[in-house]
Structure formats: C-alpha cells, structure tokens
Amino acid sequence: MRPEGSLTYRVPERLRQGFCGVGRAAQALVCASAKEGTAFRMEAVQEGAAGVESEQAALGEEAVLLLDDIMAEVEVVAEVEVVAEEEGLVERREEAQRAQQAVPGPGPMTPESALEELLAVQVELEPVNAQARKAFSRQREKMERRRKPHLDRRGAVIQSVPGFWANVIANHPQMSALITDEDEDMLSYMVSLEVEEEKHPVHLCKIMLFFRSNPYFQNKVITKEYLVNITEYRASHSTPIEWYPDYEVEAYRRRHHNSSLNFFNWFSDHNFAGSNKIAEILCKDLWRNPLQYYKRMKPPEEGTETSGDSQLLS
C-alpha cells in the first residue's frame, strides 16, 4: 500500500525501450563519427592545406547530426514527463470519483446550510490541493534534473558548429523579420545562448547571451530576466550594455532612429514596447528545439574554390 499523499508515475514499456534505443543510437553515432573523423583527418594530412576546410565542414556536419540525436533524447524525456503527468492526473481523478461515490450525497438543504456545507468541503479540500501542488513541484524538479545533462551535452556540441545561434535566430520565421544586416553581424559574435526558468517564489525566465570579443560592446555575457504569467512576459532586469566609444554614437542613433520593434531595440533597451514578444520566442521556441531552424551549409566540393558563403541546403 502506498503512503497517503504519494503519487506513482508509471512510464510505459514502449517509451522506456524507445528511450534506451535512442541512447544506443546516439552512442553508436558518436563512435561511427569518431572513426569517420579519424579517417578524414588522415586524408587531410596527405592532401595538405586544401583538405583543412573540407575537414572543418565535415566536423561541423557531424556536430549537427549529433545534435539531432540529442534533441531526440530531450524529446523522449519530455514525452515521458507528459505521460507521467497524465497518468498521475488520471489516477487522482479516479481516486476522487471513488471517494465521491463512497460518500452519500446530502439531503435537501436550505441555502444557508448549503453554504455552510460548501465551506466545510472547501476547508477539507485545501490541504489536498496543497499536497497536489507539492507533488507536482517535486515531479517537475525531477524531470528538470533529467533534462539537464542532455542540455549540457547539447551546448557542448553546439560549440563545434560556428555561428550556430546566429543562423538559428536569423532563420526563425518571426525573428527574421526583426533582424537587420547590422544585427546579423552583431549576432555573428554570439557563441552561446542559455535559458533558465525558476518557478518559485515567482515564475522567472532568464535569458543569457554569450559573446566573444567584438567591435560593438565589451560585455561577455548579457542577461535579461522576465517575470512570466499566464498572458505575458514582463521585463524585470537587464545587464547594461557597455558600448565601445567608437560605436556608442551609432548605437544611440539606431535606438532613436527606428521606433519599431526589432532585435537591436530589444537588445539595447530592455523596456522597449513589444520586447516581451522576442523574449517569449527565445524561451518557449528557440531554446527548446533550435535545430529545427538551423539551415545546414553544403560543404565545398573537392577541386572547387571556397567562397565566403557556402550554399544553403534546402
């Protein structure tokens, strides 16, 4: 018999087998990629400098393929979480129905006595609701701990794909309309994006953008925080941008010349009207599965000259 108040989440056997299968597939892909990379590097040594660019392109493609597998694992974890929550809700609903059937309904009541009875039921219900909230919070924390190693691994692999986040942000259907050529150049110095969510005591979404040295600003990390409720993301805190003197005047001009919502205005002015829209896209869409917006580049063919931009794969 389970202790009173505890919840049991059963993961279906087909999901457990599918998760293990994804793990073995990712492990096999890593081993195969390592063997292919070794053979490719041996050829690169023989062919000289002309083979270096091809090797870099191949390694970047391997990293993107590995990201596919990591995203599959993250999706399996998310699916397990949904199934566990659904099964827990069904179990609690069935228990409530059985309890309701066991208690005889009240007889004819006056409005005054009905309100008194309703108050008594509500008082009894409050500790049950509190217990359910605690159980749900514990389950959510457990699933977040399971997701973390996959997200850490994804971040490490992304480091092997130059310009990954700039590519993803620029190719998002909604973000692309908000990005100028100058924004794209600024984003080309972005090396990583991280999103953290806190549920207690308030729901907070923290966006962290990491940059390498660039001609625009001195910051290595820019953090933006938003309070989240059912209807909106509300600006809470932002790291002040330390513009270089040579660009400070241009930054001021850009910020005041264009009053419409765009990436630069969101980036430079935390309280800009409509900036919560960009925050929501980053937190709820791009962070959860960035690979769906990544446009892969065709590696240069042997014997052809490499141009500044490789051809996009359709």
UniProtKB/Swiss-Prot annotation:
Protein's name according to its UniProt entry: Testis-specific Y-encoded protein 4
A Pfam family matched in the record: NAP
Superkingdom as given in the UniProt entry: Eukaryota
GO BP field: cell differentiation; gonadal mesoderm development; nucleosome assembly; spermatogenesis
GO molecular function: chromatin binding; histone binding
Chief localization: cytoplasm
Cellular compartment(s): Cytoplasm; Nucleus
UniProt keyword list: Cytoplasm, Developmental protein, Differentiation, Gonadal differentiation, Nucleus, Spermatogenesis
